[in-house]
Amino acid sequence: IFFVYFYQRNLLYNPNENNYLNDKISFNYKEIFIKTDENIKLKSWFIEKDLKKFKTILLFHGNAGNLFNRVYKLNELNKLDLNILIISWRSFSGNEGKPTEKNLYHDAEEAVKWLNSRGVNNKNIILYGESLGTGVAAEIGKRNVFGGIILESPFTSITKAAKIYYPYLPVNIILKDRFDTIEKIQSITTPILIMHGKQDNIVPQKMGLELFEKAN
């Protein structure tokens, strides 16, 4: 119990995991750094086509890897008439700082502000969260109205997900970061698309179905 309590964020956030690194980049992008008010620079990729004509996807990645691990996804999204901004959380992709639930929300808000500063209003932004990023998208989506929200492989909460892997631990007591999406989703007025595969071996599909039912 003591190990899990003190090292839980090392288990939850895995910036050094590397998979899908051999995908060839088939899009043009600018590497930018979004500065937080704590002076942390968040490495990000920006695929800009036409900010006035097309909506902009703001992509929040999952709990492992870096920007290069999302090339396969960006290759597909780039086929659509969309601008795309993908940010890398603090401590990921060489960024400074420590990842926590509160800090990830802050990073996401800074990305929204960055787009706003370039003339993109919230109704032209589509929040796209994958796995851990779905918890961030839900929180940011609860705070404001956006053009849309996409949740790919979402969990109901980190607490419930942790119970699957650590059924013998009192996770509801010891967890610091909870990302309680199931309690937020009814407060979101932005249209939501939920995608969840049957063969997901990390987050069970039933969690996506629970969120769908709760949202409706």
List the model feature ranges, each with a label.
Residues P170-K184, T189-T190:
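Active-site nucleophile elbow and catalytic-triad environment of alpha/beta-hydrolase enzymes
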Residues I1-K35:
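An N-terminal hydrophobic leader/cap segment in hydrolases
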Residues K73, T181, T190, P204-E213:
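Short alpha-helix in the alpha/beta-hydrolase fold that links the catalytic acid
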Residues S187-T189, I194-D200:
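Short beta-strand/loop motif that positions the catalytic acidic residue
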Residues W114-R118, N122-Y168:
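Primarily recognizes the serine-hydrolase "nucleophile elbow" in alpha/beta-hydrolase
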